[in-house]
Amino acid sequence: MELQYDIDSIEVYDDFFEESTRDQIFKYLQRPKWSLNGGRDDNRFWHMNGLEKEEYFSSYLFKKISKKMNGKIKKYTITRIYANGQTAGQCGVPHPDDGDFTILYYPNPEWDIEWQGHLMFVDLDWNPDKVVAYKPNRMVCFPAKTVHYADAPSRHFNGLRISLAYKLTAPKND
């Protein structure tokens, strides 16, 4: 797998959805579908899989995302949609994603900078190079082969740090 790193290709959108949509997304992600099967065998975290099978995420929300991104992803195909959840001390591991393009959305309605849990991007020498703070209603988009990980929330945070992930495949050139 060829990794890539272009700091300028990382896009951050704040206040992405209107409040009612943000609240609805968070409500959907409060359902009892979470399981402790995300990550690797030696580093488990909370995971809600199979959201690409739900019309709300795969059609309704994806159309809203595409429109807000001026159609940039309109012709992309959804490979997977899922949510990751981390509690205090559950740190992600640096990794690239499958597919061509990754969208991460942060639905938690509130977040304090002291709770940490930021998104870390790693350069081609595997050194942390860019930090994107976890912030409610923020969307982060980047090429899938960009190495990244979610830092652990601090011990001062007693909830679940949620990220909603869309894995997309680019259209084939004819």
Language-model features and meaning:
Residues 1-79, 86:
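Non-heme Fe(II)/2-oxoglutarate
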Residues 59, 63-174:
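Catalytic core of non-heme Fe(II) oxygenases with the double-stranded beta-helix
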